[in-house]
């Protein structure tokens, strides 16, 4: 256990987990007792954050888990569910990878400040920071700039730390003060500082120049002939940039390059970058936020391009949510952010793996 975990456990009169207990199922009394302080921290943080969002005037919503389209990002994989209609027709649905589409439909319907503690699902993901089923804390503000949800994210993270009484987040030898003023860093500046790459030179007019980035990164990461601009970008980000983020204090990494804009809108004054940010603590990504794109035609083009690449890579593509694209035409200007609730609880409680902070974690060999 980490020092924070040991301290938390000691306060509860709980002995550290033995190696034998680690291998036992989560439902054994001994292992549950070892995890209980983390689970109590989870409940306390959930209550505190719900109170904060209510005080801020947010409506807590509950959106559906079954979706006709689970999202249209190249490397996200969704579990599927085969249903049968009352008339016997076979229906294909997916478990959502995010509540984003549904929440934005609510913005189109007239909601202005909404939040959801959403159960979401990702196939092909498992590890100290990943589970196939986890909780996404997602919230949206209509008619506000994305700096508003940036500020929210910092407050939410500090609220979690204040709730458990932890003074410093720690993970894999890195520490961060959740109460300190965050470090604001553009993606372009981060690539210059940590990888000596002029990232903006590889996206003239917002268009990805694969060969330019490959040439700039050839001595930094292993590049294959099949790698796209986005693949190379991700390799540099993961290997050379992310390890430096959120050390000592939170880092807000913002102004993502246009090819990585996803559902974010372009920065009005510079089309090479998007109104997208991520928040890091101890090298761990906690939150991902957007100034929301509301151009349905542009979003359709992005989705189709992402699904073309998904089909090339993985031999499958997900359908577009035409209902969502129609709702986009009614959406107000908005901003939103998705925060990994389990990861936040992990850092705020001193746990070392997110399955320690989940009440019923899936077994390593599947549910």
Could you say what each language-model-derived stretch is?
Residues 296-367:
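Active-site pocket scaffolds in enzymes
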Residues 159-284, 305-331:
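Metal-assisted phosphate- and nucleotidyl-transfer catalytic regions
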Residues 39-43, 47, 55, 60, ...:
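Conserved structured core elements
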